């Protein structure tokens, strides 16, 4: 790793402060269940009506209005990811990112928020037009210590603090290990670090923004309790496109690595635009602080949500209708459900213009 821009101390975030909840009453706010945009209908020349569905049938569906560019991308604007209910769009002509809360079910319809980030800086021999994903270190980019991380396809990883409007700028890192070129960045609240799983899931890279370090911490994973697969299962796995997803349960403090195995539906190349992928297998590993990744078919009351958003976990018992011990998956052309107990997969083909799961949001009255 190499830090290629001058150090900006404003980027570093403080160590988290622990707050003890009152013993006399619950401090947990009422929250929406996880949700996603099920469909959209044009509403005038510049907006669409979003049909938002929740992961539990016991919560009423919602209709929201949003700018058309958030669901119908063009050469000028592309949505590139989501974190904590904030969607990021890349404005190609000016080379800047903008954060929107339009897809957040509790955000204002009449007064949506827009946060413009500083102009992107492209490092030598890097690119900033294709983005793997974005991650926020806290619930809102308006919070003073919130850091936005952007992982670009290839070498570059960039950070900034949106709340520092007067002197906000990007803090750019160049990654040389090719196993991280297509990785997705996530923020670990437990470790107070941004983390990247390497391709194949053998290596984890972590950046501690509380310390002035120009190099990340690396951790090699050791796999345990691997399942015995038949020859046919191994051949299927080897023929799949594999992706790794790091997800943290904030309620239990556990960390999981999820491996997805997907195949093209009609045998076309992944390089062909619009290629349909179908989930053929899922493997979940519980990862400890020592780098042990233990295969598991039991995550208890938890449900994991994977999409083009930053992955997240919820306690299923907190949201009646959400299935425990499941992985929910949402992609551009598929929604699927994986049951860890028996490794069964239910998959549906559908076109999603905004394939983002939104995590639970606090409901304010």
Language-model regions, residue ranges each:
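A non-catalytic, helix-rich entry segment at domain boundaries
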Residues: 2-84, 89-96, 103-105
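C-terminal closing repeat unit and adjoining cap/tail of repeat-based domains
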Residues: 3-6, 46-64, 69-73, 270-365
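Detector for intrinsically disordered, low-structure N-terminal pre-sequences
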Residues: 16-18, 36, 47, 67, ...
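Short, surface-exposed loop and linker segments with low hydrophobicity and enrichment for Pro/Ser/Thr
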Residues: 18-34, 43-44, 135-145, 244-252, ...
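N-terminal non-cleavable signal-anchor helices
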Residues: 18-20, 38, 69, 248, ...
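Generic structural signal for residues positioned in beta-strands
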Residues: 36, 147, 184, 245, ...
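Pocket-edge structural micro-motifs
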Residues: 38-40, 91, 101, 259, ...
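A sequence/structural signal of beta-propeller blade repeats
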Residues: 74-76, 80-267
């Amino acid at each position: 790793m190499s830090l290629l821009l001058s150090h900006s101390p404003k980027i570093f975030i403080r160590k988290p402060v622990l707050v003890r909840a009152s013993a006399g009453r619950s401090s947990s706010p009422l929250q929406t269940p996880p949700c996603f945009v099920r469909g959209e209908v044009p509403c005038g020349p510049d907006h669409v009506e979003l049909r938002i569905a929740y992961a539990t049938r016991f919560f009423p569906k919602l209709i929201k209005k949003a700018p058309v560019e958030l669901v119908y991308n063009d050469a000028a604007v592309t949505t590139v990811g989501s974190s904590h209910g904030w969607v990021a769009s890349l404005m190609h002509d000016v080379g800047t990112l903008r954060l929107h809360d339009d897809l957040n079910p509790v955000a204002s319809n009449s007064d949506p928020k827009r946060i413009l980030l500083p102009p992107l800086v492209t490092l030598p021999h890097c690119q900033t037009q294709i983005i793997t994903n974005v991650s926020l270190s806290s619930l809102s980019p308006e919070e003073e210590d919130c850091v936005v991380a952007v992982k670009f396809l290839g070498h570059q990883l960039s950070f900034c603090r949106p709340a520092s409007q007067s002197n906000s700028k990007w803090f750019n890192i160049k990654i040389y290990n090719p196993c991280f070129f297509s990785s997705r960045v996530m923020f670990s609240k437990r470790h107070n670090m941004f983390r990247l799983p390497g391709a194949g899931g053998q290596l984890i890279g972590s950046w501690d923004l509380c310390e002035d370090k120009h190099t990340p911490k690396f951790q090699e994973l050791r796999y345990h309790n691997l399942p015995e697969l038949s020859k046919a299962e191994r051949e299927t796995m080897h023929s799949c496109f594999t992706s790794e997803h790091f997800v943290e349960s904030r309620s239990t403090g556990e960390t999981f690595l999820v491996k997805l195995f997907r195949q093209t539906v009609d045998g076309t190349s992944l390089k062909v635009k619009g290629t349909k992928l179908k989930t053929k297998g899922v493997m979940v590993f519980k990862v400890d602080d020592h780098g042990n990744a233990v295969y598991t078919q039991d995550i208890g009351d938890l449900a994991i949500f994977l999409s083009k958003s930053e992955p997240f976990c919820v306690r299923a018992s907190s949201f009646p209708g959400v299935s425990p011990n499941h992985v929910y998956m949402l992609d551009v052309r598929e929604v699927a459900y994986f049951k860890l107990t028996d490794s069964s997969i239910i998959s549906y083909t559908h076109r999603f213009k905004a394939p983002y799961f939104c995590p639970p949001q606090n409901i304010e009255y």
